[in-house]
Amino acid sequence: MRITQVTPLKEGFEIEIPNIASDKSISHRSAIFSLLSSSPARIHRYLQGEDTLHTLQIAQQLGLEVTKEGEGMVFTPPPSGIKEPFDVLDCGNAGTAIRLYVGLLAASKGYFVLNGDAYLRRRPMNRVVKPLQSVGAQIFGRDEGNLAPLTILGRPLAAFDYQSPIASAQVKSAMILAALQGEEASFFSEPERSRDHTERMLRGMGARIDEDQEGRLTLFPLLGKRLDPLEMTIPADPSSAFFFAVAAAIIPGARVKLQNVLLNPTRIEAFKVLESMGARLHYSITSETYETIGDIEVSHHTLQGITVSERISWLIDELPALAIAMALAQGKSRVQNAKELRVKESDRISVVVNNLRLLGVEVEEFEDGYEITGGTLQGGVTIDSHGDHRIAMSFALAGLVVPLTINDSACIDVSFPNFLEILSSIAKVIHESQTSR
């Protein structure tokens, strides 16, 4: 188990960061969608994190050929479509991978087994499995298909008109991937718009996905047609960049410029909340290919408490880092309608609450969120990451203010392998290793 100690800063900092980890959501999708393309895709800056490498390995098992080309990669699709794999498909800790692959493979001819690590095998899959089963998918697993490993007997599925009870990009993406392989148009709606990378990328590849004024999607099947190949440089992940936005916001005299960041409106809601709390932000667009990309400058200013209760699906991954900003803001902050946090890599509501209490913060826990009374932090404590990369990175930010130790920090490598390298450029970070857990 890796242990990380963070020593607090004595003064502010100014830094430009050109090497934020590539966007995880787009990296996952670039590999998966390339299985449906007509010719080789050319991808630059594919995220070399554990989650996305598991996704890429599975794509290779399903027939995708991956070769290096300069600093990029070429994804050549299987000529005869998705092939039945020889072995189990290991998703590691990647919830996005298993849920998107369930949708893709449920409608693909063949026998498939999706599995993952101990953390993933505890995460619920019914939100994807049940709607797919309702249109004929044969998916089996522990707890009546709710828990991995999942066995899929892929076959053509019936057209559907599905109204999701939750706003989830993973559920939406799974249903879209199944619908593309059908014979008639399907329909999908959700209570509020979730992240839309899947629609944007697939439209760019030639798929027809229509959206009405209420956000209801009409999904037209490919009917044997192959998609156009992707050709893209994957931008920096705004969820990863947000850690350093919070770092700048909470440290007096700090300023950070985050370069080449994905600026999709469904992905920068946390930045808008931070700005509403008082931090100074400036955006500049640098390019627009599939997605809007640009730079974000963040500088310190006194933060005020805030209530976050809307568009939760747009900032669900950033809420742990935002909790650190809330703990150092003036007044009370509250997060509501975020029950989804309980089924992430850890129960992020309980873990955030318990770790903030260790730091001396007054916090009240609710079923769907928490209320934080801002003020100061008390250091000299050990934070348990619970194997959750976003918990480990979020509380590393608290280490910029007070000294602390984070247990099981190796989980950071899942999504942001160079996080500690960047953090070390502004703070003293010490690694210690232990052989036993």
From Swiss-Prot:
Active site: 317
GO annotation, biological process: amino acid biosynthetic process; aromatic amino acid family biosynthetic process; chorismate biosynthetic process
Disulfide bonds: none
Pathway field: Metabolic intermediate biosynthesis; chorismate biosynthesis; chorismate from D-erythrose 4-phosphate and phosphoenolpyruvate: step 6/7
Annotated positions binding phosphoenolpyruvate: 24, 95, 123, 170, 348, 390
Pfam families linked: EPSP_synthase
InterPro entries from the UniProt entry: Enolpyruvate_Tfrase_dom (IPR001986), Enolpyruvate_Tfrase_sf (IPR036968), EPSP_synthase (IPR006264), EPSP_synthase_CS (IPR023193), RNA3'P_cycl/enolpyr_Trfase_a/b (IPR013792)
The keyword S-adenosyl-L-methionine appears for this protein: no
Gene Ontology CC terms, in alphabetical order: cytoplasm
UniProt catalytic activity: 3-phosphoshikimate + phosphoenolpyruvate = 5-O-(1-carboxyvinyl)-3-phosphoshikimate + phosphate
This protein's UniProt keywords: Amino-acid biosynthesis, Aromatic amino acid biosynthesis, Cytoplasm, Transferase
Enzyme Commission number(s): 2.5.1.19
Chain residues that bind 3-phosphoshikimate: 24-25, 29, 168, 170, 317, 344
Subcellular location: Cytoplasm
Top-level EC class: transferase
Main location: cytoplasm
CDD domains in the cross-refs: EPSP_synthase
Gene Ontology MF terms in the entry: 3-phosphoshikimate 1-carboxyvinyltransferase activity
Family stated for the protein in its record: Belongs to the EPSP synthase family.
Stored NCBIfam families: aroA
Subunit text: Monomer.
Protein task: Catalyzes the transfer of the enolpyruvyl moiety of phosphoenolpyruvate (PEP) to the 5-hydroxyl of shikimate-3-phosphate (S3P) to produce enolpyruvyl shikimate-3-phosphate and inorganic phosphate.
UniProt name for this protein: 3-phosphoshikimate 1-carboxyvinyltransferase
Source species: Wolinella succinogenes (strain ATCC 29543 / DSM 1740 / CCUG 13145 / JCM 31913 / LMG 7466 / NCTC 11488 / FDC 602W) (Vibrio succinogenes)
